Amino acid sequence: RICYLAPRDTQICAPGQEICYLKSWDDGTGFLKGNRLEFGCAATCPTVKPGIDIKCCSTDKCNPHPKLA
C-alpha cells in the first residue's frame, strides 16, 4: 500500500499495513491555524479519542490532504 505521510509525501507501507489514515483535530491554537493533521499507514484503522476525526481507506494514495485532494 502507498499512503501519504505528509501533504505531498508518500511512502510504501510496511508489510501488513494495508490501511491509510488521516486524523484531524483542533489543537486550540485558534481560527488561523485550523485543524492539525496526521497521515499514516496502519494494519487496522486506529482508535481515536473524542474530538479527533479519522478517515481510513484501503487504496493507494487515498488519504490526501483535504485541500490538495
UniProtKB/Swiss-Prot annotation:
Q: Which CDD domains match?
A: TFP_snake_toxin (cd00206)
Main subcellular localisation: secreted
Descriptive protein name? Toxin Lc a
Its subcellular locations are: Secreted
Q: Which UniProt keywords are listed? A: Acetylcholine receptor inhibiting toxin, Disulfide bond, Ion channel impairing toxin, Neurotoxin, Postsynaptic neurotoxin, Secreted, Toxin
Another remark in the UniProt entry says: Has the length of long neurotoxins, but only 4 disulfide bonds, as short neurotoxins.
- Here the disulfide bonds are 3-20, 13-41, 45-56, 57-62
Q: Give the organism the record lists.
A: Laticauda colubrina
Q: Which family does it belong to?
A: Belongs to the three-finger toxin family. Long-chain subfamily. Type II alpha-neurotoxin sub-subfamily.
The reply to whether Isomerase figures as a keyword in the UniProt entry is no
Q: Which InterPro entries match?
A: Snake_3FTx (IPR003571), Snake_toxin-like_sf (IPR045860), Snake_toxin_con_site (IPR018354), Toxin_cobra-type (IPR054131)
At the top level, the lineage of the source is Eukaryota
